[in-house]
Regions:
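Nucleotide-activated donor-binding/catalytic signature segment of Leloir-type glycosyltransferases, i.e.
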Residues: 181-205
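Conserved acidic donor-binding segment of nucleotide-sugar-dependent glycosyltransferases
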Residues: 251-262, 270-276
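A charged, aromatic-enriched C-terminal amphipathic alpha-helix characteristic of glycosyltransferases
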Residues: 273-307
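Acidic donor-binding loop of glycosyltransferase active sites
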Residues: 206-223, 236
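N-terminal strand-loop element at the rim of the active site
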Residues: 4-62, 70, 175-179
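C-terminal alpha-helical cap of glycosyltransferases
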Residues: 40-41, 295-321
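Donor nucleotide-sugar binding/catalytic pocket of nucleotide-sugar-dependent glycosyltransferases
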Residues: 52, 96, 102-105, 110-136, ...
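Conserved donor-binding/catalytic core segment of Leloir-type glycosyltransferases
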Residues: 4-6, 123, 133-161, 171
């Protein structure tokens, strides 16, 4: 099977796209053409796939041109933005829309009339769960993933400043939007935090281990942040704003706070003062992630579903995940 996977806004090394979906397809012996903004993010395409470069947030014309190249000879298209559904070539294979953003029921229903649709309800979000992560420490907090104003960058910087007197440092692991990069550089220059930029996914996950807490400060009413699963899979207590509550509260693995520096600070300091609570929250999150969100448990089903939608006979795969 030949699959065209396309995004115009996500980092080419996006964990869901590259390290779970594409890797599972490649490990199952399928061919992948990846349409993504490689040049914008200064990323060299991974070995084993065919790359088609596209400008970041490309206009319709340029996105259509890139997608037309990508779908040539493909048996299936996996699109990661709704905008890409508007620039599909007339002659094309079956299309899968992997819903990554908040969308209305009407838009989803319209897409279902023409295409296949993946949502968290049909295919659970997942992560690579560590076998035996170290217990949470008490000297640093971490934020994993893209840094933008909507992801609470200003609050993260404000929190980092308030944590300095307590000897707690902040590690930010992920690329940043152009509008917040100067703020992050200034904060790093004066020693408030450590910003590592984009880090390869497996290494980034290891970097989170042993932190006091994983932070998710998405501005309401944003979608449920999948970084929370990464924290859970590494045994970290989670401090999240309300968009993360649907993951954190059922698992009993963290604290829900308002998008307010004082409230976030209180939550972090409460966790620091209670190592037994930190350990219990981390263990509950890890157990929940292992039971429900461990990618190796879902990879074969994902590949089989793509084969079915492409009209390729389903075979049994042993996936190296």
């Amino acid at each position: 099977m030949r699959v065209c996977v396309a995004t115009i806004v996500h980092h080419p090394e996006d964990a869901r796209i590259m390290h779970r979906q594409i890797r599972a397809l490649l490990d199952a012996g399928h061919e992948v053409t990846y349409v993504a903004p490689f040049s914008h993010f200064n990323v060299t395409p991974a070995a084993g796939l065919t790359a088609v470069d596209v400008p970041y947030d490309a206009a319709y014309g340029r996105a259509r041109t890139a997608l037309k190249r990508g779908v040539k000879g493909a048996d299936l298209v996996i699109a990661h933005e709704h905008r890409l559904l508007r620039v599909l070539p007339y002659r094309r294979p079956p299309v899968v829309w992997d819903v990554r953003e908040e969308v209305s029921d009407g838009r989803r229903a319209r897409a279902l009339r023409r295409h296949h649709v993946i949502t968290p309800a049909t295919m659970p979000e997942a992560t690579q769960v560590a076998a035996a992560p170290p217990p949470p420490g008490d000297t640093r907090v971490v934020h994993l993933g893209r840094l933008t104003a909507d992801n609470g960058v200003r609050e993260l910087i404000g929190l980092a400043e308030r944590l300095v007197p307590y000897g707690i440092r902040m590690d930010l692991i992920g690329a940043a939007g152009p509008g917040v990069r100067p703020l992050l550089r200034d904060a790093q220059r004066v020693g408030l935090l450590d910003w590592f930029g984009h880090v390869p996914h497996r290494h980034a996950l290891r970097m989170t281990q042993g932190a006091l807490a994983g932070l998710s400060l998405t501005r309401p009413p944003g979608g449920t942040p999948t970084k929370i699963l990464d924290y859970m899979g590494r045994g970290l207590p989670v401090v999240t704003t309300s968009p993360g509550a649907p993951l954190v509260e059922p698992a009993g693995c963290g604290l829900t706070v308002p998008l307010d520096v004082n409230g976030i600070l209180d939550a972090v300091l409460d966790l620091r003062e209670d190592p037994l609570r930190r350990l219990a929250l981390g263990r509950r999150g890890h157990a929940h992630a292992l039971a429900h969100h461990h990618w190796p448990d879902h990879a074969a089903a994902f590949v089989a579903r793509m084969e079915d939608w492409a009209g390729v006979p389903v075979v049994t795969h042993s996936l190296a995940v």
